[in-house]
Amino acid sequence: MSSPIPGSVASLLSQARQTWAEAVLEDQPAEKYRGAHIAALRAAASVLALRARPAVTGNRRPTSAWVLLDRLAPELSEWTAYFSDSARRRAAIEAGSVSVVSERDADDLLRAAGEFIAIVERMAGMLSLDAAS
C-alpha cells in the first residue's frame, strides 16, 4: 500500500501540468518556451518538496532549483543540466529578448518539459514511499 503524496507535492505537480497545458496553447515561441520552463521548474519543486531536508545554514548564497535538484536527485542529472541551460534563455525572454528562441526551440523545450513532468509524476509515488521510511 503506497503512502499518499503530500498535498504540497500534489499541488505543485498539478500546477506543473496546468502550466504545461497553457504553454501548449501559446502562439508565440517565447511565451511557449517560458511556460514550458516554468512547468518543468514546478515539477522540480515537487521533487525538492519530497526530498529536501531543512538545514541550518549561515550566509549561504541562493541556489537555483536545478542545482538543488541535481544534489538531491542525481538520477535526474541530465534533466537538471538541460533545464538549467534553458533557464538562461527564459531569463532573457523575461528581460524582453523574445528573439532568443525559435519555434523549434520552444517545441523542443515543451516536449522535454512534458516528459520531465511525467517522470516526476511517476517518481512522486516512489518518493513518497521513500520519505515514509
Predicted features and spans:
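Terminal alpha-helical segments
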Residues: M1-S133
